[in-house]
Amino acid sequence: MITDRQLSILNAIVEDYVDFGQPVGSKTLIERHNLNVSPATIRNEMKQLEDLNYIEKTHSSSGRSPSQLGFRYYVNRLLEQTSHQKTNKLRRLNQLLVENQYDVSSALTYFADELSNISQYTTLVVHPNHKQDIINNVHLIRANPNLVIMVIVFSSGHVEHVHLASDIPFSNDKLNTISNFVTNKLTEFNQNLQDDIVSFVQSEQEEIFINKLLNTMNNHISNQSNSIYMGGKVKLIDALNESNVSSIQPILQYIESNRIAELLQDISSPNINVKIGNEIDDSLSDISIVTSQYHFDETLKGQIAVIGPTAMHYQNVIQLLNRIW
């Protein structure tokens, strides 16, 4: 446990280090912050914080920078403070959904970009799990002789568009008939479905097409539940270029791999969570990930992650995610 004065000094060191990217000395703290103590007292308190491993000295500077433990202590205090704050939730995601004709993928693509522009960090948004939603309707639209567009409408009002290759030039009337059949049978996906298909179809081609349609739809819903939309990838590269070029490759490999997807999908709490450096992975000492949940409605939800250097503007990011609905 540290004293209130040590906490004030630690907060000042973290905030200056994040703002300016340089180790912080006692003289700088006095010039920038109203600490109301002598330089000797600040140096003594900084020595205490260093002994407690909250700050560390670099060989090239007389100043101190926050350690991972120091960032952790600072972030924990922020999370405690914001957990008691009531905020007005932004409904921007629902606005994007309407603007994109309820196409979830398009809305989330814009959402990831907007979050990145606001936060100035790289963002990831995980597609919601439609396996927990109910399909209300399936519409089939012929785009050209070899392509049918399947429009899946969920009970939540969200829409997915799936391209379905077809060598069979079914008429629009036939596609409407197949659409109605599939929609009516959506609640009957059991061992009798294949018998129903055989009874319904008028040709082997129709049977092949309907089975392909059902398999494509199931695969799409399963794959979409694992889709991740990235905004502002270059922002992370730029931030890391300023600190440690050698760290960029393993970090990019991590965020583009299944490991980041697994990390985000493991989020079950609606609360904001922050992982710093080696808390994420042993090879990732230079980045932090701030995660939260977003909601389209009470049942359909997904995960958000903001990724940046360990010297991140945590307060801004936490406040932003705390306002997302």
UniProtKB/Swiss-Prot annotation:
Negative regulator of class I heat shock genes (grpE-dnaK-dnaJ and groELS operons). Prevents heat-shock induction of these operons. GO terms for molecular function: DNA binding. One of its GO terms (biological process) is negative regulation of DNA-templated transcription. HAMAP family: HrcA. The keyword Transcription regulation applies. It comes from Staphylococcus aureus (strain MRSA252). The keyword Magnesium does not apply. Belongs to the HrcA family. The lineage of its organism: Bacteria, Bacillati, Bacillota, Bacilli, Bacillales. This is Heat-inducible transcription repressor HrcA. Pfam families: HrcA. Keywords: Repressor, Stress response, Transcription, Transcription regulation. InterPro entries: GAF-like_dom_sf, HrcA, HrcA_C, WH-like_DNA-bd_sf, WH_DNA-bd_sf, WHTH_transcript_rep_HrcA_IDD. It comes from the Bacteria.
